[in-house]
Swiss-Prot record:
Keywords: Electron transport, FAD, Flavoprotein, Transport. This is Electron transfer flavoprotein subunit alpha. CDD domains: ETF_alpha. The keyword Transport applies. InterPro entries: DHS-like_NAD/FAD-binding_dom (IPR029035), ETF_a/b_N (IPR014730), ETF_a/FixB (IPR001308), ETF_alpha_N (IPR033947), ETF_asu_C (IPR014731), ETF_asu_C_CS (IPR018206), Rossmann-like_a/b/a_fold (IPR014729). Coiled coil: none annotated. The electron transfer flavoprotein serves as a specific electron acceptor for other dehydrogenases. It transfers the electrons to the main respiratory chain via ETF-ubiquinone oxidoreductase (ETF dehydrogenase). One of its GO terms (biological process) is fatty acid beta-oxidation using acyl-CoA dehydrogenase. The keyword Transport applies. Belongs to the ETF alpha-subunit/FixB family.
C-alpha cells in the first residue's frame, strides 16, 4: 500500500488536534506517514502522540534552518519525499501556512491541489462545502500525488495505534532567494483555547457595537471554556484583533458548538464556520442570513440574551 503523507501541525512540543484528524483522513488513501519538520529535538515529544493517532511511519526532518525561513524548508522536504516515496497523496491542514505550502508543493511537483476539503474519500477525492454550505461537491485532483488541505475540525479523529517507525530525512539547503525570517513579534495571546482547535467558539460581529462591548462575548466564551472569534466587520471596525477573524479572509473553524452574537451572516463569514456541528445565532434582525444555517436562533438583543445565557451556564456549573 502506498503511503499518504501528513504534514504534522505542532506548537511548543505538543501536537495540534488537526494532526490526528489528518492522519485519520490519510488512512482512506494509504498508509499514514507523518512528516515532522522543525529544529533539532522537535520530533521527540511528538512521537507517542503520532503513534497513538495511527502513524505507521514518522519522517523526521530537523535542521537549525527549519525555523529561519518562511515555508521553503517544509516545501523542500515534502517535495523530496514526494519524489522518493511516490505517496498516494499529501495532506496538510487548511491553515494560512498549510494553504501556501500546499500551493507551492503542488506547483513544484506538477500535481493537482484541493483546498479546504471537509472530507476525503477513496481515489483522492475531496469533499467541499461551498456557497455558505448550500452545496456539497466532490472534486478530484490531477497528477500522481494530489495535494489536499483539510479544514480543521471537519474530520473526526479516530485513533488507531500505528508502528510509528522513525525515518530521518534531510532538510535541503534553502535557495539563495528564499525568504528569511529576520525578526519575530509576539502574537496577542490569552488563556483561551486556540481558535482553530476549540470545540466551542463564541463570535461577535458588528452588532456588538464597540471594542468594550466585546466583554459580553468574552464572558460567555469564558463560561463555556470557549475560544473567541470575530467577523470581518467587527475586526475592520476595530472591535477585536485581526488574528481572531473568522471567514473567507480569516480563519476557518469547525467546532462542536458555534455561537454567533450580532453577526448578520454574510456568505464570506459563513464560509469560515458553516461546517460547525451546532450553530446558535443571536441577532435582533429576524431576516439576518445567519438564521438560514443556524440550528437554534434567538431574535433579540444580544446584550440581554448573552448575559442571561452566561449567568445560566455559571449557575448550572455551580
Amino acid at each position: 500500500m502506498a503511503e499518504a503523507l501528513v504534514l504534522v501541525e505542532h506548537t511548543e512540543g505538543a501536537l495540534k488536534k488537526v494532526s490526528a484528524e489528518l492522519i485519520t483522513a490519510a488512512r482512506v488513501l494509504g498508509e499514514p506517514a507523518a512528516v515532522v519538520v522543525g529544529t533539532p529535538g522537535t520530533s521527540a515529544p511528538l512521537v507517542d502522540g503520532l503513534k497513538t493517532a495511527g502513524a505507521a511511519k514518522i519522517y523526521v526532518a530537523e535542521s537549525d534552518a527549519a525555523d529561519k525561513y518562511l515555508i521553503t524548508p517544509v516545501v523542500d522536504v515534502l517535495a523530496a519525499l514526494a519524489e522518493s516515496s511516490a505517496p498516494a497523496a499529501v495532506l496538510l491542514a487548511a491553515t494560512a501556512d498549510g494553504k501556501e505550502i500546499g500551493g507551492r508543493l503542488a506547483a513544484r511537483i506538477g500535481s493537482g491541489l484541493l483546498v479546504d476539503v471537509v472530507d476525503v474519500r477513496e481515489g483522492a477525492v475531496g469533499v467541499h462545502s461551498v456557497f455558505g454550505g448550500v452545496f456539497i461537491v466532490e472534486a478530484q485532483a490531477n497528477g500522481d500525488t494530489p495535494v489536499i488541505t483539510v479544514r480543521a475540525g471537519a474530520v473526526e479523529a479516530q485513533p488507531a495505534e500505528g508502528a510509528g517507525e522513525q525515518v530521518s530525512v534531510e532538510v535541503p539547503a534553502p535557495a539563495e532567494n528564499a525568504t528569511k525570517i529576520t525578526a519575530r513579534a509576539p502574537a496577542v495571546v490569552d488563556n483561551r483555547p486556540d481558535l482553530t482547535e476549540a470545540t466551542v467558539v463564541v463570535s461577535g460581529g458588528r452588532g456588538v457595537g464597540s471594542a468594550d462591548n466585546f466583554s459580553v462575548v468574552e464572558a460567555l466564551a469564558d463560561s463555556l471554556g470557549a475560544a473567541v472569534g470575530a467577523s470581518r466587520a467587527a475586526v475592520d471596525s476595530g472591535y477585536y484583533p485581526g488574528q481572531f477573524q473568522i471567514g473567507q479572509t480569516g480563519k476557518t473553524v469547525s467546532p462542536q458548538l458555534y455561537i454567533a452574537l450580532g453577526i448578520s451572516g454574510a456568505i464570506q463569514h459563513r464560509a469560515g464556520m458553516q461546517t460547525s456541528k451546532t450553530i446558535v445565532a443571536v441577532n435582533k434582525d429576524e431576516e439576518a442570513p445567519i438564521f438560514e444555517i443556524a440550528d437554534f436562533g434567538v431574535v433579540g438583543d444580544l446584550f440581554k440574551v448573552a448575559p442571561q445565557l452566561t449567568d445560566g451556564i455559571k449557575a448550572r456549573k455551580g
